[in-house]
Amino acid sequence: MKNSESIKEFKKLNSSQITEKIDQLRKDLFDLRFKQATRQLNETHKFKIIKKQVAQLLTLSKSQSTSQKPAD
């Protein structure tokens, strides 16, 4: 399955861009849920795609933050 943005493209982002992208995707999820509740949503497959992208970005963010911290 080819998503609009792949993990390779996400790896090019810095931490602030990742945070902005996560916020945008979470807003998109909220909008999808609202459309679903009002029976206006025809593209239910987008839930899975967006949730997967959020998970990928959170994983990438966590790995970047742990690699930047010095070992104690």
Curated annotation (Swiss-Prot):
UniProt keywords, alphabetically: Ribonucleoprotein, Ribosomal protein
Organism field: Prochlorococcus marinus subsp. pastoris (strain CCMP1986 / NIES-2087 / MED4)
Pfam families linked: Ribosomal_L29 (PF00831)
GO molecular function: structural constituent of ribosome
Primary gene name: rpmC
Origin: domain of life: Bacteria
The family this protein is said to belong to: Belongs to the universal ribosomal protein uL29 family.
Gene3D superfamilies, per database record: 1.10.287.310
GO biological-process terms attached to the record: translation
Protein name, per record: Large ribosomal subunit protein uL29
Family matches, as InterPro entries: Ribosomal_protein_uL29 (IPR050063), Ribosomal_uL29 (IPR001854), Ribosomal_uL29_sf (IPR036049)
Assigned GO CC terms: cytosolic large ribosomal subunit
